[in-house]
Amino acid sequence: MSPKTLYDKIWDAHLAHEAEDGTCLLYIDRHLVHEVTSPQAFEGLRMAGRKVRAPEKTIAVPDHNVPTTEGREDPAQMTEESRIQVQALDKNAREFGVHYYPVDDIRQGIVHIVGPEQGWTLPGMTVVCGDSHTATHGAFGALAHGIGTSEVEHVLATQTLIQKKSKNMKVEITGKLNPGVTAKDITLAVIGATGTAGGTGYVIEYCGEAIRDLSMEGRMTVCNMAIEGGARAGLIAPDQTTFDYVKGRPHAPKGAQWEAALAWWKTLYSDDGAHFDKIVTLKGEEIEPVVTWGTSPEDVLPITGVVPSPEDFTGGKVEAARRSIEYMGLTPGQKLTDIEIDTVFIGSCTNGRIEDLRAVAEVVKGKKIKSGLRAMVVPGSGLVRAQAEEEGIADILKDAGFEWRLAGCSMCLAMNPDQLAPGERCAATSNRNFEGRQGYKGRTHLVSPAMAAAAALTGKLTDVRELI
């Protein structure tokens, strides 16, 4: 038998049928749904008189539209469109009998944080959701990716998905990271090196010493942004770090089932000699804290750098750089550390976990944020929020001047009350920085939680290494 990659193994284990043209039917182990991409899918089932094929494998949670301020159960806090979507999910989840975490449940939060937290995400699984950042779950050695609304309906009805197999890509991060450099810096550095189309047509497996050294939360951050690199999905082979994280979670296997699952999970790695169609290698010790300067996740530079000139680019990227610089209100040659900000947003499915909040608290403890700055911390779930309060993190953040919010997607995207005003500049721990992502004419700089904390203290983009 020829050597297989991790992706090959998971794909083959879930392949139900393959047509002559390479179109395949895959079995889906977990289907996560939220309020934005599911209403039409459930309505399609209703009109066809169909049931959800596997409600026990379907998990619903509202996250994109929900307000993050107290009293958010009041429908008046939402726009009409948001209210309709949240209420539709509530109705559909109850009617079709899927697992459901409503707004008033402490387990509610961002779907890609709730899934792993509750033990729904396990190694070797296929996981889909009508959301591009489903790649997050690949940190567990699961094949996880986003799907469209018509596909959401197909999975609800059949527990299968039609697709063609992607190619294999390996991204290796060798060596050790230096102090102040985090998983967010890794994933941004990779996108900066490969571009937003570098992974197009591929499933990425992340490996190397720097990846193995990451916690599960760090690995989720890395895989979360595989889609920003153009990939279909991102994977990290499971190991003892993975098993320790999963064990004991509410929906993880127990007893003999755990032992049986563990035996299989330990086979989930790329065999020696397995073929990768593309290989990218970065040296971990050479990665610095980074920040995006433009309107694409590939517009990445070390915090020690300067805003580039359009003439630094070639081809179509010259005009793209010119437009980005103009939109962002920057000047070529300007030091990144001279860029003043108005807002700091810490949260999202990229960086809304307890480890992220600990990193922020470590930087700001005993200090105050810049006067006049708006800074908010939005935990990724109600359980993350409760844990942060129990550990004293919430008090540290509030004492420093941060707004302490309820769980949700919040300012990651302009679909709820948390938005930037036109021209407002934000240091954000989220995953996308295109025009208008956080609000009409808002300006976004993507950074790690530690870097966002540093920016909150100084009022400008700052090298966190100077503060730790």
Curated annotation (Swiss-Prot):
The keyword Secreted does not apply. Pathway: Amino-acid biosynthesis; L-leucine biosynthesis; L-leucine from 3-methyl-2-oxobutanoate: step 2/4. Its EC number is 4.2.1.33. It comes from the Bacteria. InterPro entries: 3-IsopropMal_deHydase_lsu, Acnase/IPM_dHydase_lsu_aba_1/3, Acoase/IPM_deHydtase_lsu_aba, Aconitase_4Fe-4S_BS, Aconitase_4Fe-4S_dom, IPM_dehydratase_rel_enz, IPMI_cat. It is an enzyme of class 4 (lyase). Its cofactor is [4Fe-4S] cluster. [4Fe-4S] cluster binds at C349, C409, C412. CDD domains: IPMI. Binds 1 [4Fe-4S] cluster per subunit. It catalyses: (2R,3S)-3-isopropylmalate = (2S)-2-isopropylmalate. Keywords: 4Fe-4S, Amino-acid biosynthesis, Branched-chain amino acid biosynthesis, Iron, Iron-sulfur, Leucine biosynthesis, Lyase, Metal-binding. Belongs to the aconitase/IPM isomerase family. LeuC type 1 subfamily. Heterodimer of LeuC and LeuD. This is 3-isopropylmalate dehydratase large subunit.
